Every structure is written in structure tokens, then in C-alpha cells.
């Protein structure tokens, strides 16, 4: 079932129920708050492992030199930088993010590192992408889908803009599979992480939301089914680090 406001009047913002029309604003406030410390946030949430996850996410993507790639929820540009190495000088990347602060951080970082050619920045909502049909060889989203109000709409849009034969990939925090690890993970998420957020970023509330948003995100099998419903074929996922994150893939034929 779609999470759109047309079908339900409320949705979740972490563990809170809020008006669906308000979620984008609330999420925007979180990411505006953490944008300058976004890598710190990911380091705290993953104990630094997110860098290895992202490298593997890009290394195993179906992408080649000369391809055109859309990286949604592109944040501070780390996925785009890794992708640029895959598509080469003839390839192009569009870094899309709904949050202007995140987009600005990503642009500044990539310019500072000399990554400027054939790289565009677009502020856009994943639920209604401003691109033509069938115009990207690969569409990626890393640690962004759980913050989208209408995930079904975002997946349909990813499918729409993907070329026939192309691949969509989602890297997202998921459902831990090891029973023994769940209480440890919960303690880190709900007791340690907000305190670290208060200590290092002076923002415990945003970090608490981010931990809660992981628990409200669809588990692996459910997200796989959602991708199938959006039109993707050969949908599958690979758990990393005991299911703390999962990489979901789907193809358009």
C-alpha cells in the first residue's frame, strides 16, 4: 500500500505519527541541522563502517564507462564521487537531493576535490522526479529511502526514469538478522547514539529520529516486494554486516 497522503492522513516520523503533508518539512529540518556534520552522523550510526558499505555498493553496481547515472538523496557527494570513477570521463552523473543544505555541502566537497566535469546538481523530490522517461542507465539511492514519505511513489519514479536494461540500487539500514545482536544494536541506537549526537553535534533529537526511522523502514522482504510492485524485475537484496544494512537491486526490462 502506498504511504501517500492521498491514501492516509498520517504517516510516521520516527516513532511519532504526523500529518503526511508535514513529514517532508520535518525531515528537511533534520537534514538541514545535520548537513555540515553528515559524515559524522553516519560514522556514529555505523561505527564508521558506512564507508566500506558505500564502496561495495558502488563496486557491485551494474555501471560502465560512459553511462549516465542518477544518485538520489546524494547528500554530501560520497556516492557520486565513487560513481564518477566507474563512469569515467565520458560518463555523467546527476546528484539529486530534496534538501538544499545537503546539496550545497555535496557540491562544495566535490568541487574541492576537483570533481566537476559532467556532474550536475538538482534539488528534487524523489516522489516526482523532474526527468524524462528512460534517461538513466543506473539509479541509486543511499540511506535516503527511509526518509521518503511515499516510498512506493519514489520507487515508481526510479523505474520510470531508468532505461530499459538499466538497474536501480538502494542501500539502506535494514532489519538485523542475528537475534543475539539485536539488543546490542538497540542499545547503541537508542541510548548511545542520541548522547553522541548531543555531545558531538549538539543535536540529540535529530539522531534519535534517525535511529527511529530505521526501525520504521520496511524490512528486506517487504522492500523487495515493493520494488517488484513498482515494476522492477529480478528484485533481490544482499545483507551486509548481519542485516544492519541491505543492498536492494532491481532491473527494468
Swiss-Prot record:
Protein purpose: Methyltransferase required for the conversion of demethylmenaquinol (DMKH2) to menaquinol (MKH2) and the conversion of 2-polyprenyl-6-methoxy-1,4-benzoquinol (DDMQH2) to 2-polyprenyl-3-methyl-6-methoxy-1,4-benzoquinol (DMQH2).
Enzyme Commission number: 2.1.1.163, 2.1.1.201
UniProt record similarity statement: Belongs to the class I-like SAM-binding methyltransferase superfamily. MenG/UbiE family.
Enzyme class, first EC level, given as a word: transferase
PROSITE patterns attached to this UniProt entry: SAM_MT_UBIE, UBIE_1, UBIE_2
Source organism (scientific name): Xylella fastidiosa (strain Temecula1 / ATCC 700964)
Keyword terms, alphabetized: Menaquinone biosynthesis, Methyltransferase, S-adenosyl-L-methionine, Transferase, Ubiquinone biosynthesis
Pathways involved: Quinol/quinone metabolism; menaquinone biosynthesis; menaquinol from 1,4-dihydroxy-2-naphthoate: step 2/2; Cofactor biosynthesis; ubiquinone biosynthesis
Pfam families listed in its UniProt record: Ubie_methyltran
Catalyzed reactions: a 2-demethylmenaquinol + S-adenosyl-L-methionine = a menaquinol + S-adenosyl-L-homocysteine + H(+); a 2-methoxy-6-(all-trans-polyprenyl)benzene-1,4-diol + S-adenosyl-L-methionine = a 5-methoxy-2-methyl-3-(all-trans-polyprenyl)benzene-1,4-diol + S-adenosyl-L-homocysteine + H(+)
Amino-acid positions noted as binding S-adenosyl-L-methionine in the UniProt annotation, renumbered to this chain: 76, 97, 125-126, 142
HAMAP family the UniProt entry points to: MenG_UbiE_methyltr
Gene coding for it: ubiE
Protein name: Ubiquinone/menaquinone biosynthesis C-methyltransferase UbiE
Domain of life: Bacteria
Entry's Gene Ontology BP terms: aerobic respiration; menaquinone biosynthetic process; methylation
SUPFAM superfamilies associated with the record: S-adenosyl-L-methionine-dependent methyltransferases
MF terms in GO: 2-methoxy-6-polyprenyl-1,4-benzoquinol methyltransferase activity; demethylmenaquinone methyltransferase activity
Amino acid at each position: 500500500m502506498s504511504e501517500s497522503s492521498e491514501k492516509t492522513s498520517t504517516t510516521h516520523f520516527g516513532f511519532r505519527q504526523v500529518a503526511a503533508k508535514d513529514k517532508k518539512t520535518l525531515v528537511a529540518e533534520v537534514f538541514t541541522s545535520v548537513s555540515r556534520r553528515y559524515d559524522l552522523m553516519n560514522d556514529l550510526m555505523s561505527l564508521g563502517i558506512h564507508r566500506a558499505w558505500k564502496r561495495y555498493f558502488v563496486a557491485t553496481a551494474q555501471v560502465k564507462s560512459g553511462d549516465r547515472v542518477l544518485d538520489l538523496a546524494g547528500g554530501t557527494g560520497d556516492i557520486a564521487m565513487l560513481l564518477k570513477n566507474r563512469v569515467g570521463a565520458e560518463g555523467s552523473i546527476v546528484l539529486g537531493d530534496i534538501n538544499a543544505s545537503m546539496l550545497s555541502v555535496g557540491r562544495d566537497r566535490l568541487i574541492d576535490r576537483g570533481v566537476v566535469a559532467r556532474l550536475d546538481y538538482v534539488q528534487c523530490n524523489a516522489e516526482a522526479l523532474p526527468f524524462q522517461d528512460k534517461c538513466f542507465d543506473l539509479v541509486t539511492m543511499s540511506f535516503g529511502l527511509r526518509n521518503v514519505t511515499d516510498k512506493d511513489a519514489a520507487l515508481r519514479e526510479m523505474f520510470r526514469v531508468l532505461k530499459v536494461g538499466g538497474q536501480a540500487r538502494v542501500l539502506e539500514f535494514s532489519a538485523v538478522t542475528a537475534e543475539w545482536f539485536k539488543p546490542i544494536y538497540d542499545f547503541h541506537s537508542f541510548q548511545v547514539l542520541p548522547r553522541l549526537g548531543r555531545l558531538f553535534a549538539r543535536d540529540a533529537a535529530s539522531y534519535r529520529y534517525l535511529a527511529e526511522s530505521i526501525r520504521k523502514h520496511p524490512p528486506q522482504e517487504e522492500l523487495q516486494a515493493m520494488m517488484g510492485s513498482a515494476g522492477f524485475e529480478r528484485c533481490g537484496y544482499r545483507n551486509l554486516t548481519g542485516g544492519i544494512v541491505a543492498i536492494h537491486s532491481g532491473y527494468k526490462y
